[in-house]
């Protein structure tokens, strides 16, 4: 269908702008129109000319097809979005993340037309809410062990957490937000859980902790708290505390992890890091939570961390391979290899640039490059074929 036969979807202009963290004034200056014009485009009171739409698409780095794409009927999340660092994150960053969540959900829905992702397999738990007060450690340990048992993980270290999470039907993506103060976040969409990781996190132990933290939110909090609840700083702090403790309990089970803690030497904790694939800081926090070590021993460990400048950059961070999301990558490669879709078709129909699709779906760089045919020589038709065509 030609562009002049299609109608621009006003919401898509707003969605694209907000996802890039821009105000209407900022976008208007970049495309040389008034703020009022942008407002009218977004409200559907006026449609941008083809030239202005092309300028908006270029500035916001979306294919023009994005602005013609119908909005799904079920565009709203079915749970609150659980953001880490909500207190210090700017409203622009939170709103940009929300729009990117919606866009990735649509990419996921598009792929589900062609492939079957793993079915969701999460246990149901009864969350023991205690108002503003965080639930106790015993209950957190119980939730973490319930999930381990449900997934058949035993009590030992978890090898590849992203692999396990995706095989059990949780969608995982990485986002290039280019906005500070946001780590990971999670949400339910139509009974499907999504976890989004910040591309700024580049160490495996931190990525694993973020995933475990978000699983805690999806498992414990999604059915009980609304977006309005999360605006309450005390409630948000409570839920973050619970998700942190869940992550520690899930990654480092009380019984088996405790047996490995027989020294307060940082060098011993480095050895444990290699085994458990958890940061030294996380393990110190876990020892404190479980009461494995005394307050003086915890202080001694923290002092060693400070002396060695390990709080920001720990030993083994570079040596440990980073676990990567793969489900959507596998789906796209499968479709491309079997010529079900082309790279150009994927870009056109999802309304996302090749670069952004590669980021969302963790594709190898260049996977969606459209290679031009370099062949300029063709065989002549045979004389028999020429006669037939006459």
Where are each of the predicted segments found?
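Active-site hotspot residues in diverse enzymes, especially metal/ion-binding acidic/histidine motifs
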Residues: 1-390
């Amino acid at each position: 269908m030609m562009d002049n036969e299609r109608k621009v979807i006003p919401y898509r202009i707003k969605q694209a702008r907000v996802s890039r963290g821009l105000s209407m004034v900022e976008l208007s200056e970049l495309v040389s129109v008034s703020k009022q014009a942008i407002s009218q485009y977004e409200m559907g009171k006026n449609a941008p000319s083809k030239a202005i739409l092309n300028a908006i698409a270029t500035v916001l780095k979306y294919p023009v097809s994005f602005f013609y794409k119908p909005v799904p009927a079920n565009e709203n999340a079915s749970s609150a979005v659980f953001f880490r660092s909500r207190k210090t994150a700017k409203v622009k960053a939170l709103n940009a993340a929300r729009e990117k969540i919606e866009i990735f959900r649509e990419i996921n829905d598009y792929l589900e037309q062609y492939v079957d992702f793993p079915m969701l397999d999460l246990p149901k738990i009864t969350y023991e809410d205690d108002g503003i007060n965080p639930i106790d450690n015993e209950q957190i340990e119980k939730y973490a062990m319930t999930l381990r048992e449900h997934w058949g993980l035993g009590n030992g270290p978890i090898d590849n957490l992203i692999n396990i999470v995706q095989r059990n039907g949780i969608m995982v993506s990485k986002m290039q937000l280019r906005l500070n103060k946001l780590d990971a976040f999670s949400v339910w969409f139509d009974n499907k859980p999504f976890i989004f990781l910040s591309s700024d996190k580049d160490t495996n132990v931190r990525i694993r902790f973020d995933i475990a933290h978000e699983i805690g939110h999806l498992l414990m909090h999604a059915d009980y708290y609304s977006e309005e609840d999360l605006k309450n700083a005390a409630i948000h702090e409570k839920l973050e505390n619970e998700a942190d403790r869940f992550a520690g309990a899930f990654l480092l089970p009380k019984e088996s992890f405790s047996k490995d803690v027989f020294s307060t030497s940082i060098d011993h904790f480095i050895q444990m890091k290699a085994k458990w694939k958890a940061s030294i800081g996380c393990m110190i926090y876990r020892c404190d939570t479980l009461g494995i070590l005394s307050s003086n021993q915890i202080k001694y460990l923290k002092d060693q961390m400070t002396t060695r400048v390990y709080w920001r950059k720990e030993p083994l961070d570079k040596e440990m391979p980073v676990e990567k999301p793969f489900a959507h990558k596998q789906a796209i490669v499968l479709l491309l290899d079997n010529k079900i879709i082309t790279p150009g078709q994927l870009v056109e129909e999802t309304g996302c640039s090749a670069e952004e699709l590669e980021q969302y779906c963790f594709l190898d760089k260049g996977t969606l490059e459209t290679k031009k045919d370099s062949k300029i020589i063709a065989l002549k038709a045979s004389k028999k074929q020429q006669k037939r065509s006459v």
